[in-house]
Amino acid sequence: LVGDRLFVTKYSYGYSKHSFPFSPPIFDKRIMFKSPKRGDVIVFKTPADNRTDYIKRLIGLPGDKIQFIDANLYLNNSEIFKSKVLNKSKIYCGDKLIDVFRFEEKLPNGKKFHTVYLKDYTYQNSDEFIVPKDHYFFLGDNRDCSKDSRFLSSVGYVHKRNLVGKAQFIFFSSDKKIGNIFTFWKWHKSIRLNRSFKKIN
């Protein structure tokens, strides 16, 4: 969420210029590269400007085929099944608190995580995405309120040199409409204890 402060391990996938503050042009390639795992939650620089940090879940590896059919996720022509966890829950979509349905999804490598959808049953379809060499395909867990790799003009496929690191946990979270980590005199109103010191799955 907006207002979350994250601990990110930048060594998880090797190093690129984006591993350093302000992305200095030290080198153009990625060194000591380690391949990320499907299901990792990763911070990356969006390809549109190479400056903005995004945090999303890695779904597609190079060569993978990804498609949504009737709002169900298909990976390499196999459906990623989801089971309902809660009939209704509330989450933030931007600044608005909205009702959602919460599901658990399981990837082929056994990775389980929760996703949320605005409706119990939707009929969302997409074109087939084929991930290019050295690129990755990311999705937000908030499927109906996420700008991610499905939007090719703004995010699209992410090159490995744009990876910043693996998100490990949220160490501080506050409602930015009230205050932030620096306005400590407002913490009693702004801090979100249910999200602070929370491990990222």
Regions found by a protein language model. Give the residues of each.
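Soluble "head" domains of membrane/secretory-pathway proteins
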Residues: 2-201
